[in-house]
Amino acid sequence: MLKPSIDTLLDKVPSKYSLVILEAKRAHELEAGAPATQGFKSEKSTLRALEEIESGNVTIHPDPEGKREAVRRRIEEEKRRKEEEEKKIKEQIAKEKEDGEKI
């Protein structure tokens, strides 16, 4: 018998198609090294994903486009922060060179 049971899993998602997509995406994340949300009984990433879905630790985002936009904003913000940090470092190096030439 499949553990977790399909009936239990279908209580967590709107349809069996959503379940398959969610399981596949989470299994890929786990294979890529994403941190687990719990301890597992299973060895395979697909079964681990099902365990997380059953426990409620992994769910479908209610607004996927909103999530994508939030991720885009976070990436852009991180990029801006890195550019500002790089600019400050370059300014500091230029200032140190200028101070070194004065001596």
Curated annotation (Swiss-Prot):
It catalyses: RNA(n) + a ribonucleoside 5'-triphosphate = RNA(n+1) + diphosphate. Promotes RNA polymerase assembly. Latches the N- and C-terminal regions of the beta' subunit thereby facilitating its interaction with the beta and alpha subunits. This is DNA-directed RNA polymerase subunit omega. GO terms for cellular component: cytosolic DNA-directed RNA polymerase complex. It is an enzyme of class 2 (transferase). Belongs to the RNA polymerase subunit omega family. SMART domains: RNA_pol_Rpb6 (SM01409). The lineage of its organism: Bacteria, Bacillati, Bacillota, Bacilli, Lactobacillales. It comes from the Bacteria. Residues 62-103 have a biased composition (Basic and acidic residues). Its EC number is 2.7.7.6. SUPFAM superfamilies: RPB6/omega subunit-like. Keywords: DNA-directed RNA polymerase, Nucleotidyltransferase, Transcription, Transferase. Pfam families: RNA_pol_Rpb6. Residues 52-103 are annotated as: Disordered. One of its GO terms (molecular function) is DNA binding. The RNAP catalytic core consists of 2 alpha, 1 beta, 1 beta' and 1 omega subunit. When a sigma factor is associated with the core the holoenzyme is formed, which can initiate transcription. One of its GO terms (biological process) is DNA-templated transcription initiation.
